[in-house]
Amino acid sequence: MQSRRKFIKNTGILSAGLMAIQSQVFASEASVFNFPVKDFISKRPPLAERKFTSKAVEAAIVRIKKQIANPELAWLFENCFPNTLDTTVDFEIIDGKPDTYVITGDIDAMWLRDSTAQIWPYLPFVKEDAKLGELVKGVINRQTKCILLDPYANAFYKDFDKVSEWKNDLTKMKPGIHERKWEIDSL
């Protein structure tokens, strides 16, 4: 399992890579990236099975892939960049407000810090895609609900009635809380 620190570090590396791509570092003239062309088939879920789609993100994938000379790197970008939207978000409207629960790893729980890190790469696209903007508002709304439930917890369940396996920890565990280990970077 990947640590949160490594996840955030890798997200930063991906963001730097995106900026490098846009600055022509990976221009097609770069002979170091000229490999034999292979068929790289998308590993993304079929469109009907994706949790969320964004027209702006999809357009960016097409645009950026064209700028990446190495077909394998282009394929990796196409599969990795939209992964949070494709597989980990649960977006709905609750009481007239957007609500977005983001699974942050292999555990069905939402960490405040990690859910922020997962949607961070999509922030530049919210002006182009109102639906994506609603998804981001939903994350903020969900995080607010979580903090109001317990400002000292760091990971929460979608269902605020669910009881954690850590319910007997020597802390004030409540239903809806997966883990109560306050982290300063959750703020």
Where in the sequence are the language-model features?
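Amphipathic alpha-helical dimerization/protein-protein interaction segment
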Residues: 55-93, 142-146, 155
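A short N-terminal beta->alpha junction/helix N-cap motif
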Residues: 44-52, 64-72, 106-110, 124-131
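Basic/polar, acidic-poor N-terminal "presequence/leader" segments
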Residues: 33-48, 97-113
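Residue-level signal for alpha-helical transmembrane segments in multi-pass membrane proteins
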Residues: 15, 19-22, 123
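C-terminal segment of N-terminal export signals and the immediately downstream linker at the start
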Residues: 22-61
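Internal amphipathic alpha-helical repeat/solenoid segments
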Residues: 82-111, 132, 156-157, 178-179
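Aromatic-rich carbohydrate-recognition surfaces in CAZymes
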Residues: 108-136, 140-187
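N-terminal secretory signal peptides and thylakoid transit peptides that target proteins
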Residues: 1-15
